[in-house]
Structure formats: C-alpha cells, structure tokens
Amino acid sequence: ITELIESGNMKTGKGLAANSVNGIITVIQNSLKLAYALGTIKEYAADKIRRPKTKEKEVTCFTLSEQKKIERAALAGKKTKWLGIVVCLYTGLRIGELLALEWKDVDFQKGVLTVSKSRHEGKDENGRYAQIVESPKTVSSRRCIPLPKQILCELRMLKRKSRSVYVISNGESSIPVRSYQRSFERLLKKLDIPHKGFHALRHTFATRALECGMDVKMLSELLGHKDPAVTLRRYVHSLMEQKKEMMNKVGNTYFKEAK
C-alpha cells in the first residue's frame, strides 16, 4: 500500500491518490472474500488493511452577487438551455443528473423532480465514444427534490416551447456534458466572473441552503449524499459562518440587557 501511495502511478512514477488506492484495496478485499468463500484460501484477513485517509476537496462556491449575476444572464438570455444553470443553483443537481433529466421526471402537480439517472461521456459496448445514461450508483442518489415555486414557473414556460423529451436540450436533441460545461465557462467569462467548475453551482446551492437555516440531514438527502457526515465535513465552513451569525444574534439580543 505504501508503494502505491509513493510511486504507484505507472505513467508518471509518482504516487496514486488516496481514492485510487482505496479502489484497489476494495478490489483486493472482494477477490479474497470470494476466494475464502470458495475454499481457495483458508483465512480471510484483508479487512486489516489500513486504508489511506482521503482529503476533503476544498469547496468553492459563487458569492451572492456572482450568483445573482449568473441568474439574471441565464434567465434573460435567448438560449433556453441556460435555465439548467439556474435549476442547479436551486436544486444542487450534478451536471450529469441535469442533462439526463426528462420532462416525465418533473411532476408539475406535486412540484417535485425525480432524479433517477445520470449522463456521462464514455465508450459504448463497441468501444466508440458515446453519451451514456445510467441509473445512479447509490440508492441515496435516487431522490425526489421539491422545487421552489419560482423554478417551477420557469420550467412550465420552458416546457410549452420544448420539442424534446429532455428538460435541457439543443432543439430536440440532448446536450453532451462537455459541451454544456464549455457553455457555462463562456458565460462566466462573458460576465467577468472568475472561473469555477460547473460543480460550484452545487456547492453554491448547499451553502445558500445552510445560510437559510436548512438542517444538515435534509440537505444531505437533497444532495443525494449517502451519509450526512459527508455533507457536514464538506460544508463545515458554511456551518461555522452560520454559527457565528447565530452567536452574534444571541449577543445582540441579551448582552445589552445585562449592562
């Protein structure tokens, strides 16, 4: 394991990331479990392998003024596909989930959308480059998200004009993930907003939700996290800002009465 961490990358000779090492460990453990079940080996002890700790990625999100700038441009623009950017800001959808979303996944009567699949780029069974739509890898990623009434209204107007089965589309066809990412990058450049990845929209939703007082468990379910602890670790900075605000409110309310 130490060798993998220090020099396991066959291309560069450098170490592998903790996530990559943990993936290898999982394959080893599953293989040995099967061997033990089949009687090929007498003892299974792979659970004792110490996994390297993964570092939580730094969360980057848009400021409130940047968010408002993006929203105004997306809603005022002629490109209807840009509405997807606003949808992500108010639902926390991943880009693959957004681009796999079909109109049948939006229940206008109940005001909810169902996340049941995701789009990504890869190779098909013939080894050719393709847009692949698959079910989520985890049960928690399959979820229903209540929509703010403002977003529901925008989606209703879009549906009247849409000729596609997909919510976000180019005419009748679906949009490739990379193509949509590039459109987003161009929009940021046009608005003179510092570059951030598309995933920053998801982080922005989570940050604003916490600022509004949403509890971590509810946010975790909306984001499709398997464990609220993941949400807690990832957005601990946002929670600290919220705690500071609450503590200042307590001070402002009661300290002056004690003087």
Q: Residues of each region from the PLM?
A:
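Short, basic (Lys/Arg/His-rich) helix/loop patches that form interaction surfaces
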Residues: S7-K14, R72-K81, T91, I145, ...
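Basic, Lys/Arg- and aromatic-enriched nucleic-acid-binding interface segment
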Residues: K14-A18, N22-I24, A37, I41-E43, ...
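Hydrophobic recognition helices of helix-based DNA-binding modules
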Residues: L4, I28-Y36, L155-L158, A209, ...
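Proline-centered turn/helix-capping motifs that create local helix->coil transitions or kinks
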Residues: A35-A45, F108, K117-D124, R156-S164, ...
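Catalytic-site neighborhood detector that most strongly recognizes the C-terminal catalytic loop/helix
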Residues: K53, K57, C61, R119-E121, ...
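C-terminal secondary-structure termini that scaffold catalytic or DNA-interacting sites
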Residues: K110, E121-R142, P146-I151, M157, ...
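N-terminal core-binding DNA-recognition domain of tyrosine site-specific recombinases/integrases
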Residues: I1-T40, E56, S174-S179, P194-G197
